[in-house]
Amino acid sequence: MDLRTGEVITAPQAMNGVYTWEINNPLYFTITRHQQRPFLLNQDIITVQVRFNHNLRKELGIHKCFLNFQIWTTLQPQTGLFLRVFRYQVIKYLDNIGVISINNVIRAADHVLFNVIANTIECKLTHEIKFNVY
């Protein structure tokens, strides 16, 4: 849902994309939180935020786009190592597709979490997306 207007994001808006070779460093990756074994669980909870670059947002007609992935895993990875592997694999997947869009970034993260990185239990996606109104 668009946070600015409250309208549902349409399929053409979500599939609108840019070729990967047209934009340098299209995505920013940060780990905003890493909870190690909270509440005596045998899982770590890692929150990764993926931000779209200014040039990518300009091409897609987006004012703001943050994708927040809350990941439950039984691994006990170092925070920097997990981020490096996650970032590299997502960019690799997008380079193989050749197009960066909102849907493709979500698909890439899903592929990395459940097919590449072992022991992922669950992933919850929240987003902050605002399209340009004008």
Swiss-Prot record:
InterPro entries: Gemini_AL3. Keywords: Host-virus interaction. Pfam families: Gemini_AL3. GO terms for biological process: viral process. The keyword Ribosomal protein does not apply. Increases viral DNA accumulation. Enhances infectivity and symptom expression. Homooligomer. Interacts with the replication-associated protein (REP). Interacts with host proliferating cell nuclear antigen (PCNA). Interacts with host retinoblastoma-related protein 1 (RBR1), and may thereby deregulate the host cell cycle. Oligomerization and interaction with PCNA are necessary for optimal replication enhancement. Belongs to the geminiviridae replication enhancer protein family. This is Replication enhancer protein. It comes from African cassava mosaic virus (isolate West Kenyan 844) (ACMV). The lineage of its organism: Viruses, Monodnaviria, Shotokuvirae, Cressdnaviricota, Repensiviricetes.
